[in-house]
Swiss-Prot record:
Similarity-based family: Belongs to the ATPase epsilon chain family.
Subcellular location: Plastid, Chloroplast thylakoid membrane
Further comment: A stretch of the chloroplast genome is duplicated within chromosomes 1 and 6, resulting in the duplication of the gene. The expression of these duplicated genes (Os01g0790900 and Os06g0120500 respectively) has not been demonstrated.
Gene this chain is encoded by: atpE
Gene3D superfamilies: 6.10.140.480, F0F1 ATP synthase delta/epsilon subunit, N-terminal (2.60.15.10)
Function noted in UniProt: Produces ATP from ADP in the presence of a proton gradient across the membrane.
Organism: Oryza sativa subsp. japonica
Keyword Magnesium: no
Record-linked HAMAP family: ATP_synth_epsil_bac
Membrane-topology annotation of the record: Peripheral membrane protein
Name this protein carries in UniProt: ATP synthase epsilon chain, chloroplastic
Entry GO terms, CC: chloroplast thylakoid membrane; plastid; proton-transporting ATP synthase complex
Keyword Methyltransferase part of the UniProt annotation: no
Length: 137
């Protein structure tokens, strides 16, 4: 069996394909979705989206929050923004992480600290996405 996965943002369609399974970051933690999953509507948290293709290859994307609906082997993810892991430059992601870490330690005031921590979280997620090692089949 397979799942139909659609990942949409206001700017573009990120994904429209049949897959075997996904691992999705939600506000209550990560969930794995296999065929015949119980219907669910859930908020999507900032985090990685792991996609297992029909050929058992794994791909990674990064979601920047949104909403997901899973019903009848169809997964529709409406995201505020998203990136495919293959579009993320590993060196650039690592540099952004180092800059974000420095900005947190230099932040002055609550607003600046909150913004720096959000940027740090985003940078960590991007680095995690490009460094993820998929499970062996």
């Amino acid at each position: 069996m397979k799942l139909n996965l659609y990942v949409l943002t206001p700017k573009r369609i990120i994904w429209d394909c049949e897959v075997k399974e996904i691992i999705l970051s939600t506000n209550s933690g990560q969930i794995g979705v296999l065929p015949n999953h119980a219907p669910i509507n859930t908020a999507v948290d900032m985090g990685p989206l792991r996609i297992r293709l029909l050929n058992d290859q794994w791909l990674t994307a990064v979601l920047w929050s949104g909403f997901a609906r899973i019903v009848n082997n169809e997964i529709i993810i409406l995201g505020n923004d998203a990136e495919l892991g293959s579009d993320i430059d590993p060196e650039e992601a690592q540099q952004a992480l180092e800059i974000a870490e420095a900005n947190v330690s230099r932040a002055e005031g609550t607003k600046e600290l909150v913004e720096a921590k959000v940027a740090l979280r985003r940078a960590r997620i991007r680095v995690e996405a490009v460094n993820w090692i998929p499970p062996s089949n």
